[in-house]
Amino acid sequence: MRLLGLYRGIDTVELAHNAIALIESEKPAAVVVDATGLGVGTVDELKHCVYRRLVHEFMAGGKAMNNNKHANKRAEAWDAMRAALTAGIELPDDPDWETDLCGTEFGFNNKGAIQLERKDMMKSRGLPSPDLGDSLAMTFAVNVASSLRIPAVSTPINVQPGQELNRWMR
C-alpha cells in the first residue's frame, strides 16, 4: 500500500487531470472518487474521459448495502478497511496515517448500526479531517477482488461464533 499523491488547494478539473495521469501510469482496476461536495466536479470531469468505466462515485452519506449493520456508506467502507487491516494489509510507517485511522471514533445509531464520528465533532476535539483514512476506506467501497490476488492471512483471527469485531484499530 502506498500513497500516490496528496492534492489540496487545486480545482476539480486539475484534480481530474492528475487522476487521469495516475490512471495511465498505475493502471488500477478501479478509481473511487468522493462525490460529495467539491468531488462531484472531479467525478463529472472523469466521466467524460476514456477511463469513465473505471470511475466509481462514493457518497459517504449514501445508503449502505446492509443498513442494519452500517449507518451509511462511510461506516461500511471503514468497516471493510478495518477487516482488511486486520487480515494483514500493511500501511506506510507514517504518523499521519495513524492519526487519521485511530482518531476517528465510532458508535452505534438508534438502530444499532455502526456510525462513524462526524468530522465536525473530530474538529471540536482538535483533530483534522481524516482525509487519508477516508481515501483508504473508499478503496474498499468497490468490489474489485475478482481481478486482484489477495495474499493469505498468515495469522488466523480467533472470533467465536456470534462474536463480532467492533473496534477499528484499537
Locate the predicted segments by residue:
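Charge-patterned, long linear interaction tracts outside catalytic cores
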Residues: 93-156
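Mg2+-dependent endonuclease catalytic cores in nucleic-acid-processing enzymes, primarily RNase H-like
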Residues: 1-113, 157-170
